[in-house]
Structure formats: structure tokens, C-alpha cells
Amino acid sequence: MAGTSHADAYIGLGMTDDGSGTAGLAGLNALLAPPTRPGCASPVNTGQAHYVLDTAEFALHRWATTGIRPARAPRLQVDTSGSAPVFVLDAHGNVEGGVRTPAVDAPVATLSGLGQSGASFCFLFGTTTPFTAERLAALYPDHATFVTKWTASTARGVASGFLRPADAAELVKAARQSGVGG
């Protein structure tokens, strides 16, 4: 999954997810102002892995009970031309390829599963580097532009089999309620 880490901010946000849809907006806001963890040097990853993992669990159950295979994703892009392999990054610093979510296709931050330092388990949390207000304004001159790009990415996720429709609705609602753009 592009832009995710082994553990992320949803570990804390998920405790407040009561199914009402407010967790989507909390997750989007966390992209803009990522939380930290005690002992970790940088704000933790706020990628949207939990939505894709929810879909994967559904797809696994469906495969086991009906034989319908889950969706297959392209691999994360890796450059092996140097002395050590490195991820291929887009203009925003997010990895290319893999399962895509709105957080990497309509980005408001650079998301990585790498680069976290600090105490004990910090390396599992990856990092989030929010874009500056100037960069956000250049990417999304108005709120409608952001919502359109976020919604299109969400629709691609559903069509590709990597987002569930209910999660997609929560993501789109969060984009509409956000203050991103303009």
C-alpha cells in the first residue's frame, strides 16, 4: 500500500471510531496535523491503511466462502539501478505504484513507512510530513478542486477492489467537510 507503514495514527484514532463517519474527517485532519508518539522523533504515518485492510479482510472472507478471488495490485515501484534498491517517489515524495488511496493520489502530505527514529517501536510508525499552506494552495486553488481529486481517487479505489463502498462514502464525506483548498 503506497504511503503506509506497519503501524500508523489509526491505532489511536481507531479507538474513537464509533462508526458514525467522524473518523474519516479525523483521519484527514491527521494528515494535515499528524500526531506524534512518545519517544518518536517525527510525526507518525497517517496513511489510510485501515481502509485497505478492511477491504482485504472482506475479500479474504469472500474468497474463502465463494471462491471469488481478491483484487490484485501492482507492486510498489522500486529502482534497482543503484547500489541499493530505493522506492520510486512521485513529485510529492510519495511512493509510486501499489494500492493507491486518496491520501497519496490527492495528497496533502508526504507519507512514508520509512524514516522514523526514536525509542523502541517507533520504526514501525513511519512518518507524515504535511505540505505547507503555499503548496496546498498551489495544488488545490479551491475546495472543489481538492474534493474532485479526492473523490476520483476514492472511486478508483472502489472500482479496483481496494476500498469498500461504505469506507469510500466516509472518505468523500471527510473531503467535503475538510478545509482543504483555496
Question: What are the roles of these predicted feature ranges?
Answer:
Residues 1-182:
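C-terminal His-loop and adjacent cap/lid subdomain of alpha/beta-hydrolase
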